[in-house]
Amino acid sequence: MLKVFLVEDEFVIREGIKNNIDWKAHGYEFCGEAGDGELAYPMIQRLRPDIVITDIRMPFMDGL
């Protein structure tokens, strides 16, 4: 299973993406989430996801 990590500063959008996709049915494991790039960076280094879904414009550190 590929591990997916989500980075999105808008809580409603983040929850919508996280909760409305049947990750396991599509062969993915949802391994974590963060509200901005600064919080996400150490988590991504620790969790080593295969895929990162990220917003581009976020406070502190953008998705690029």
Model segments located where?
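Receiver (REC) domain active-site loop signature in two-component systems and cognate sites
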Residues: 58
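Non-catalytic signal-transmission and effector/linker regions of two-component phosphorelay proteins
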Residues: 1-3
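Conserved catalytic motifs of ABC-family nucleotide-binding domains
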Residues: 48
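Two-component/phosphorelay signaling modules centered on CheY-like receiver
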Residues: 10-31
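Active-site residues of response regulator receiver
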Residues: 55
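Acidic catalytic/metal-coordinating carboxylates
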Residues: 36-39, 62
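Conserved sequence signature across two-component system core domains
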Residues: 7-8, 34-35, 52
